[in-house]
Amino acid sequence: MRQTKTGILLANLGTPDAPTPEAVKRYLKQFLSDRRVVDTSRLLWWPLLRGVILPLRSPRVAKLYASVWMEDGSPLMVYSRQQQQALAQRLPDTPVALGMSYGSPSLESAVDELLAEHVDHIVVLPLYPQFSCSTVGAVWDELARILARKRSIPGISFIRDYADNHDYINALANSVRASFAKHGEPDLLLLSYHGIPQRYADEGDDYPQRCRTTTRELASALGMAPEKVMMTFQSRFGREPWLMPYTDETLKMLGEKGVGHIQVMCPGFAADCLETLEEIAEQNREVFLGAGGKKYEYIPALNATPEHIEMMANLVAAYR
C-alpha cells in the first residue's frame, strides 16, 4: 500500500502588504469583493465600493494599520508566520504552508507550495475557531476554485472549526488565568467576537451558536459564574443590523453603570491583528474609561504560544 504524505495548510484572513493607502485599497478591494463577505447586488455594490468606500476608507484604515505595524510587517502576518514556523518545528516531517484568503501569501500559493513537496493529502486548518460562512466558507470556496484548475487533486481534510476543542478551551483558560494573576480578577470578563450581519445567522450561519459554545465552555473551565462573563460582537460594518450586543455600546453602558474593572478577550482571533490591537485594546479602552470605568485590560490572542501550537498539532493529528 502506498504511504500517504500529508501537508498542512494554515489559512487566515489576510492583511495589506504595507500600512499605506495604496496597499490598503488593494487589500480592501479584494476582501470586500468576496460575496461571502458582502452579498449585496453587484449593480449596487460596485459603484459604492469603488466610488465611495475605497477612496474614503483606505487612507483612514492605513493610519490605523500604521499605529500597530511591527518591524517585520503587520501583526497578523508576523504572528501567522510564527505559527507556521513553530508548527513546522513541532511536526518536522510534515510540510506546513500558510495561505490567506485575501492578500499575500495567497491560498493558491500555499497549495502549490505543498504540492511541490509531493504531498497527496492536505489538512486544511482555517484559523477561525468558530465557523462562519464569511470566513471558513470563503476558504472553502477559494480552495475549490484552486483545485478545479488542477489535473491531479490531493486528498483533502477540511477542519470546519474547533469552537469546543478541549485543548483550545484550556489554552484560552490558561491565558485568562495569567491575566487575572497579573492584573487582578476583574468585575467582568468580556468575550468579544467579530460580528456578522444578523441576516446571515437568520439564513443558517451557525456562527452565533458556535460563539456561545466557546463562551460556555470557557466559563466552565474557569469556574466563573455566568454573570461574570459576557459575550459581545465587534467590528460591525454598514447599516444593516449585526449580531448583538455590540462591544462598544456594551462597554459604554457598563462604564456608565459603575462597573470598574473589565478584562477583554477575543477568542475568535487566533492571532492578534488590527481589530484586536487597535479596535479592542485601544479604541474600546477609551470608550470604557470615558464612560466612567476605572481599569481595562486586553488579553492577547493565543498567537504562537507553545500551548497554541500544541493545540494545532493535536488538532491536525486526528486528520493525518
Swiss-Prot record:
Q: What is its EC number?
A: 4.98.1.1
Molecular function terms in GO for this entry? ferrochelatase activity; metal ion binding
Q: Where in the cell is it found?
A: Cytoplasm
Q: Does the keyword Protein biosynthesis apply?
A: no
Q: Where, in this chain's numbering, is Fe cation bound?
A: H194, E275
Q: Name one GO cellular component term.
A: cytoplasm
Q: What does it catalyze?
A: heme b + 2 H(+) = protoporphyrin IX + Fe(2+)
Note the CDD domains from the entry: Ferrochelatase_C (cd00419), Ferrochelatase_N (cd03411)
Keyword tags: Cytoplasm, Heme biosynthesis, Iron, Lyase, Metal-binding, Porphyrin biosynthesis
InterPro entries attached to this UniProt entry: Ferrochelatase, Ferrochelatase_AS, Ferrochelatase_C, Ferrochelatase_N
UniProt pathway: Porphyrin-containing compound metabolism; protoheme biosynthesis; protoheme from protoporphyrin-IX: step 1/1
Question: What is its EC class?
Answer: lyase
Q: List, alphabetically, the SUPFAM superfamilies matched.
A: Chelatase
Q: Which GO terms describe its biological process?
A: heme biosynthetic process
User: Where are the coiled-coil regions?
Assistant: none
Specify the superkingdom: Bacteria
- Kindly indicate whether the keyword Lyase belongs to this entry: yes
Q: How does it assemble?
A: Monomer.
The text of the family note is: Belongs to the ferrochelatase family.
Q: What does this protein do?
A: Catalyzes the ferrous insertion into protoporphyrin IX.
Q: Which NCBIfam families match?
A: hemH (TIGR00109)
Q: What is this protein called?
A: Ferrochelatase
Q: Per the UniProt entry, what species is this protein from, by scientific name?
A: Escherichia coli (strain 55989 / EAEC)
